[in-house]
Amino acid sequence: MLIYLIDNTIDGQGASPRELRAVLGRLREGLEILTEPFHAVSLKRVKSLRPSHIILSGQSHPWEDYSPKSLAGVFEVIRKAPQPILGVCGGHQQIALSFGAPVGLMERLEPGEGYEGAKRERGYFPVKTDASGIFKNLPSKITVWHSHFDEVKELPEGFRSTASNETCAIQAMQQEDRPLFGVQFHPELFDEEHPDGRRVIENFLHM
């Protein structure tokens, strides 16, 4: 099994890809993980690698700092690759952007803290799920780690919301006719007290 982990940070600034890679290695012994930067990604590359799954990491900078040209390849992969794809935090937002849906600052300010002139949802908070897809065999309310101040403002066409809370209406989404999933939270940052994120990742790897 080859996991293609797309690093959405600029110049490696950001912990998301490293944390995802470390957790994947712990969860599945012998798992092969290839990490490449977002600007090197193309549909041709994916067809050549033939990974079993694709994961989109969080990003390190505001989306305004990413040029359309640098994102063109990964956007095409998101729209066309047949493999199961999971977007985490910024990767979730990246899925929305690739289909033309808006991403912006959260309007609801609780719970959160001041962050660069906005409010940031940071810490372990509950979300309500529909218990389908990557939330299969999980309770209808799970507790997962959040660290964001942007959110997907509207669902892309052909998607449905699969998780929400009072702070963020689209905590997770899935494309109706493909195994394409986005989660605004960080399932990889689970611990013994908050194990739900682990099951989310395991469910994805079983697809």
Regions found by a protein language model. Give the residues of each.
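Flexible loop residues that form catalytic
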Residues: 8-11, 59, 178, 188
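Glycine-rich, phosphate-binding/catalytic loops in enzymes
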Residues: 20-23, 70-75, 103-105, 162-163, ...
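Flexible gly/pro-rich beta->alpha loop and the following alpha-helix that scaffold active-site loops
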Residues: 21-87, 99
